[in-house]
Each structure stands twice: as structure tokens, then as C-alpha cells.
Amino acid sequence: MMSKLGVLLTICLLLFPLTAVPLDGDQPADRPAERMQDDISSENHPMFDAIRGCCMPLSCMLLCEPCCG
């Protein structure tokens, strides 16, 4: 009985391998560079001043880059 089950499992894996399953292209794991860029962007920091193009002087201590001093 176990050998028949093993043969059936082997045939199923040969006919439909697990790598043939299509992956969702919208997964963030598929694009790690974009995900990292979005996470560390200083423009998205709440202390970033878009008009001046830099962070407020006190936010340098809060790891907001670039600082204008």
C-alpha cells in the first residue's frame, strides 16, 4: 500500500512540480530593492521639509537625512 502511494506521489510531482505554480507579481518579496528604498527614504520622514528639500535642524538627532544644519 505504501509503495503505491509513493509511486502516485512521485507521478504527481513529476506531472505538476511545485515550481510551476505562478507567483503573484505584487508580492513585496519579489522586489526587495524597491521595498528597501521605500522604507529608508528621507522624503517620507515626517520631519522632512519638502519646500527646503531637507530635514528640520532638530530632526538630525532623529535620524532624518539630509540635514540642513
Curated annotation (Swiss-Prot):
The keyword Disulfide bond applies. Keywords: Amidation, Disulfide bond, Ion channel impairing toxin, Neurotoxin, Secreted, Signal, Toxin, Voltage-gated sodium channel impairing toxin. Transmembrane segments: none annotated. It is found in: Secreted. Pfam families: Conotoxin. One of its GO terms (molecular function) is toxin activity. Expressed by the venom duct. Is not hydroxylated. Contains 3 disulfide bonds. GO terms for cellular component: extracellular region. Residues 21-52 form a propeptide. The modification Cysteine amide is found at C68. Residues 1-20 form the signal peptide. The keyword Signal applies. The cysteine framework is III (CC-C-C-CC). Classified in the M-2 branch, since 2 residues stand between the fourth and the fifth cysteine residues. Mu-conotoxins block voltage-gated sodium channels (Nav). This is Mu-conotoxin-like Am3.3. The lineage of its organism: Eukaryota, Metazoa, Spiralia, Lophotrochozoa, Mollusca.
